[in-house]
């Protein structure tokens, strides 16, 4: 099938699509803050309805709404998205207002532009363009759009338990992906798991004058000492028993890793760093990036950190950490190992609070959805994609794809590029990438539809009264 009409439609409506993205990006929807979440959910639902998707907005009690949408007919494929965004951070680090939606030099700057409103709007635009140029979708797309990705998706996990029928599908399209520093599209067929925690140390009933520092325990030092036992100076996780639970990489994944290379020089330049952890490079760096577990201190808070001098002995100290999990680690296992590890070293007083967790998810490159995505990438970008057997990031993939047995295969791609800086200041997407992602999904839909037609034809040829006789086969 020729996609020239489809591509022309996308190009003619490029400005309109960009303006729709601007509109959503100008609406703050920081899940951790809670302001504007209902309005954002309603705006997303209206955006879905605008392109002909039938919707239903589910209220989730004290959580944020989940929008379900469906369009097309045929075999079902889940399309995941989220409308919440990460906290802005320091405004002084931004070149433009984080919710300005400023377009400068072909890039749209806003918190959520890359993660993940750009992906969501590209999906919706692809549905519109396909229906306008080809008619009804040859497959059924089931959109699941949540507002708690940044909080660990607690409502989504409950939603999957309450509505498992909505998640029964032949495949899942996820909202993560980018073009690397060499402009190659990166496709992921799974995601690391995650557990996000808070460690707390407690001291006096309130902050004290630091003159008491010689005789009153300091929870800040206490926490630092506990943290120092979790990893080695070289960044290796040293929790007792942790490494014994790491599964060896299987032959299929080992083969997939051989085809992946990181643009080490380009990434170091982009990140402005001098080198990699433990001076890794080449295949070892790729392997660690994709299959290495992590323990990251995401932030720390204690005492006085505002402007001006204030000599205090803190009453509390807090650190937030995330663990990215690889086979065979689970959130519950890591939490238990960490608790035991700290207790054995005399840190029973350190409090562990689980803020959010999600299991890992992983699919085969031979799945129908993976093949459709990989083939479409070649067609749109004109180059072979990098296919990650597991993305280094995380999400509620296990909740969405783990409803059925065996798990629903997933493939992920997105609108970002190496300089999008999601979660950081000046988050942005290149509008050219945004438009290419629309064209990308259009072709994925078509390939999945063609696979469906081939399957139906095969069934007709081999079943019941539509079976083709031996003589007919010879005649053909």
Label for each model-derived stretch:
Residues 108, 114-190:
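Acidic/histidine-rich catalytic neighborhood of metal-dependent amide-processing enzymes
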Residues 2-111, 132-139, 321:
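Acidic/His- and Gly-rich active-site-bordering loop/insert found
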Residues 84, 230-234, 339-348:
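A common structural junction motif
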Residues 83-85, 144-153, 175-179, 203-206, ...:
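Acidic, glycine-rich active-site loops and adjacent beta-strand->loop/helix elements
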Residues 104-115, 383-387:
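Short pre-catalytic strand/loop immediately N-terminal to key active-site residues, enriched for Gly-Thr
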Residues 212-235:
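A short core secondary-structure module
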Residues 186-202, 410-417:
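Flexible glycine/proline-rich, aromatic-decorated loop/lid segments
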Residues 181-182, 238-316, 324-337, 345, ...:
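An extended, acidic, His-containing surface patch that forms the Zn2+-binding/catalytic region
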